[in-house]
Amino acid sequence: MGNTFGHLFRITTFGESHGGGVGVIIDGCPPRLDLSESDIQGDLDRRRPGQSKITTPRKETDTCEIISGVFQGKTLGTPIAILVRNKDARSQDYNEMSVKFRPSHADATYEAKYGIRNWQGGGRSSARETIGRVAAGAIAKKILKQVANVEIVGYVKRIKDLEGNVNPDTVTLEEVESNIVRCPDADMAEKMIDLIDQTRRDKDSIGGVVECVARYVPRGLGEPVFDKLEADLAKAVMSLPASKGFEIGSGFAGTLLTGSEHNDEFYIDDNGNIRTKTNRSGGIQGGISNGEHIIIRVAFKPTATIGKEQKTVTSESEETTLAAKGRHDPCVLSRAVPMVEAMVALVLCDHLLRWQGQCQVLT
């Protein structure tokens, strides 16, 4: 249970961190979409470990294989299966964690729920599970771009107390990818990199915020009342490992304003379209996209697995200490960027298909 996401564009991820591989089954992809591994590999490369000194040193190529659902370079409309094989697992690094629970990790709760857990690399709770999401998200991005010209760009907004100055209306993928921390503010990016590197040397971890903008989203996406667009976006990104908070538009800061200050006033643009002068709603009103840019923020906690000694307990309820071994991210933010983009793309693609299926039948 809990491994499937979406309605019409539906994905099921599978695999564990130290198993034979990880992947995804995608059901509901429209037929006749041009698709090859190269359409997917770019985003997987952005997500993969071992990219730089501020990520885990685990070395994986994360090479994807499409094993069903595509024929002669086009989707068939049948389930698409994508597999990425694990190549560099070092399970012996986790021997101590077979009995000791990592503080603030999923170890203890998985044990409590299932009565058994895969302690090698965290199993299903590992961020390696997100490979399937990113692969499926790459396909969703391609559909959104081809059908509606939607652009999705994520970036690191904040690391600990260091916050970048980024304009979501104009930021480009090239600017995001110009440095290893994926913060388009070049000056702040250098400070972020230094902070993460120092944290790594201290055997500790830090968190931060990823911001993501979806531009040119058509008006009308969202299914009130329980499947409002922002509700599905919140569920999507809050299902990512280490996520702890969600905001859209003005977010919590909007509570400091009055209605007259917060309302996005309407006007008619030169093309006769209804637009808003401001975008404090974040592109969604009443749970439905309004045609403005959708802007969300996701908070990620500091990585739970750290090399500093901490107090914990064993599966036999004995108090002990743990200084985790193995290879872990001192900060997940730079690798979380393509994960957030993927989840946003999956939600928007699913809602685009739902909108067309319901609202475009009778024109």
Swiss-Prot record:
Organism: Crocosphaera subtropica (strain ATCC 51142 / BH68)
One cellular component term from this protein's GO annotations in UniProt: cytosol
Function: This reaction introduces a second double bond into the aromatic ring system.
Gene Ontology terms for molecular function: chorismate synthase activity; FMN binding
A Gene Ontology biological process term: chorismate biosynthetic process
Lineage, uppermost ranks: Bacteria, Bacillati, Cyanobacteriota, Cyanophyceae, Oscillatoriophycideae
Pathway(s): Metabolic intermediate biosynthesis; chorismate biosynthesis; chorismate from D-erythrose 4-phosphate and phosphoenolpyruvate: step 7/7
Any Pfam family hit: Chorismate_synt
Keywords linked to the UniProt accession: Amino-acid biosynthesis, Aromatic amino acid biosynthesis, FAD, Flavoprotein, FMN, Lyase, NADP
Annotated region (Disordered), positions in chain: 36-58
Protein name in the entry: Chorismate synthase
Catalytic activity: 5-O-(1-carboxyvinyl)-3-phosphoshikimate = chorismate + phosphate
Cofactor entry: FMNH2
Family under the similarity heading: Belongs to the chorismate synthase family.
Superkingdom assignment: Bacteria
